[in-house]
Amino acid sequence: MSVTLQTVLYSLQEEQARLKMRLQELQQLKRERTGSPGAKIPFSVPEVPLVFQGQTKQGRQVPKFVVSNLKVCCPLPEGSALVTFEDPKVVDRLLQQKEHRVNLEDCRLRVQVQPLELPVVTNIQVSSQPDNHRVLVSGFPAGLRLSEEELLDKLEIFFGKAKNGGGDVETREMLQGTVMLGFADEEVAQHLCQIGQFRVPLDRQQVLLRVSPYVSGEIQKAEIKFQQAPHSVLVTNIPDVMDAQELHDILEIHFQKPTRGGGEVEALTVVPSGQQGLAIFTSESS
């Protein structure tokens, strides 16, 4: 009876070891398939430097989107002025009194002060897909003494040669820090991406460049809301009674006086009658 139990126990131990080995094999196979470039896009991804400029706090909701280098264009009507203050509290004080009287030598100007509402994208959905005929070339060092046209010419010549793995270049475009190249044969683009890195002669030196897939995107949905500019107000209803420079100085003096509810003016732009203006706002962190 004891021998039988030992035999059964030994058989169970062997079966357990065999199953454990099989499990390890399956886990290794899963890791290989998951880590394989072919599981997603069969090419290398361009190396893009990222810099964290935000805050980390526990218990806070993670943002669903990030907007980089935000620029908002705001049209300015004729007979108006855009006034920007260093302290946003000045804006709050001025908006409590919509009509302001600006003293001139012989009369007073009655102008309207109103908040500046800016359209801001709060959510955006973009569909993206690889372009099989195009590649993205990156890794250009700073200080290259080549014009944009010279750089594009040299890249077209290099990647247009079959000995370099290239082919007929149909399109080329300079992007921000990168170059897009489009080829007539999609197999050429795929082959270049599979190689990934090339030493290209540029500006009397061999530069190691990276080639990765070009992904095109299309905006499917965008949500926009209007947000008040915290540091600026729009002054309207300005009559055509003097030249723009003189009016600029008078308005700056008026809105710098604390007795008028004003404060330190950071910038002031006047749009005379018969003209149109365009103000471009950027994020404070950019």
From Swiss-Prot:
Residues 5-26 are annotated as: Leucine-zipper. This is Interferon-induced 35 kDa protein homolog. Disruption phenotype: Knockout mice show decreased inflammatory response when exposed to infection or injury, which can lead to lower inflammation-induced mortality. Acts as a signaling pathway regulator involved in innate immune system response. In response to interferon IFN-alpha, associates in a complex with transcriptional regulator NMI to regulate immune response; the complex formation prevents proteasome-mediated degradation of IFI35 and correlates with IFI35 dephosphorylation. In complex with NMI, inhibits virus-triggered type I interferon/IFN-beta production. One of its GO terms (molecular function) is identical protein binding. Pfam families: IFP_35_N, NID. The keyword Repressor does not apply. Its main location: cytoplasm. It comes from Mus musculus (Mouse). Belongs to the NMI family. GO terms for biological process: innate immune response; macrophage activation involved in immune response; negative regulation of cell population proliferation; negative regulation of non-canonical NF-kappaB signal transduction; positive regulation of inflammatory response; positive regulation of innate immune response; positive regulation of non-canonical NF-kappaB signal transduction; positive regulation of toll-like receptor 4 signaling pathway. The keyword Transit peptide does not apply. InterPro entries: Nmi/IFP35_dom, Nmi/IFP35_N, Nucleotide-bd_a/b_plait_sf. Gene3D superfamilies: 3.30.70.330. It is found in: Cytoplasm; Nucleus; Secreted.
